[in-house]
């Protein structure tokens, strides 16, 4: 009997919900770190590509919306599931 998680177990552990060019997990980080790391992460993809970010800081929905508005990116998804905030951002 194997102690390794099956692929379906691993998928259950991964809360990413979207098929994006980049996925980054900022859970455990407090403001302003999720937005600062999102900015840096977006530098890794091209204009028009999408990135999915996870965060659990209660301030992150407001922070991510403000970040996208001021930087010109499009916030496609801002959702919360089980205390995890899920964001999909389209890079300008």
Residue map of PLM features:
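Intrinsically disordered, low-complexity segments enriched in Ser/Pro/Gly/Ala and basic residues
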Residues: 1, 5-7, 59, 77
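Intrinsic-disorder/low-complexity, polar/charged segments enriched in Ser/Thr/Lys/Arg/Asp/Glu/Gln
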Residues: 21, 48-52, 84-86
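Core SAM-dependent methyltransferase catalytic element
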Residues: 86-92
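N-terminal first-folded block
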Residues: 3-43
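A broadly tuned "polar low-complexity/structure-edge" signature
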Residues: 2-3, 21, 55, 63
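Amphipathic, hydrophobic secondary-structure cores in small proteins
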Residues: 26-79
